[in-house]
């Protein structure tokens, strides 16, 4: 007589709503990249969950990534936006990687415009042009393409110019957590822009 052995298929545990919310926010942060995503946007997207649950999910994700020794990223808040950035522990390896791909990633003009935005944000193109004394249209577009600055919208002034601020990638690239860590304004030196060293942009050069 043939004996049939029934092997039970393990039942996969269905993720909780809280876990799904954390995972969903994690996925959105990954897709948004350097631009990041604001709390307001998250609340709009997950309006059924509510403000408090979204905040708790962000906190849970922050702790999860911080405690996970096998994760090379962490959750950071820059201004009004949340972004995924690399952990300090892998900075040295990141430098080695980029040393083969990037040397002086920004020229002097780009460094100058980037610094103007960092010190005057939120900043418009007319304001940048006013400070530099020349048109900066293409440079601003290049910085957007490099994901070092982001558009925040438009002002109500004539012409409704776009408003810009530095992105999470800016903080990550230059190894700072806030604009307070930039050189103080009393030490502001335009010559350093032209040398490409104001933000220590040469740190990804040959070692």
Swiss-Prot record:
Coiled coil: none annotated. GO terms for biological process: cell division; chromosome separation; DNA replication. Participates in chromosomal partition during cell division. May act via the formation of a condensin-like complex containing Smc and ScpA that pull DNA away from mid-cell into both cell halves. The gene is scpB. Transmembrane segments: none annotated. Keywords: Cell cycle, Cell division, Chromosome partition, Cytoplasm. This is Segregation and condensation protein B. It comes from the Bacteria. PANTHER family: SEGREGATION AND CONDENSATION PROTEIN B. It comes from Mycoplasma genitalium (strain ATCC 33530 / DSM 19775 / NCTC 10195 / G37) (Mycoplasmoides genitalium). GO terms for cellular component: cytoplasm. InterPro entries: ScpB_csome_segregation, WH-like_DNA-bd_sf, WH_DNA-bd_sf. The lineage of its organism: Bacteria, Bacillati, Mycoplasmatota, Mycoplasmoidales, Mycoplasmoidaceae. Homodimer. Homodimerization may be required to stabilize the binding of ScpA to the Smc head domains. Component of a cohesin-like complex composed of ScpA, ScpB and the Smc homodimer, in which ScpA and ScpB bind to the head domain of Smc. The presence of the three proteins is required for the association of the complex with DNA. It is found in: Cytoplasm. SUPFAM superfamilies: Winged helix' DNA-binding domain.
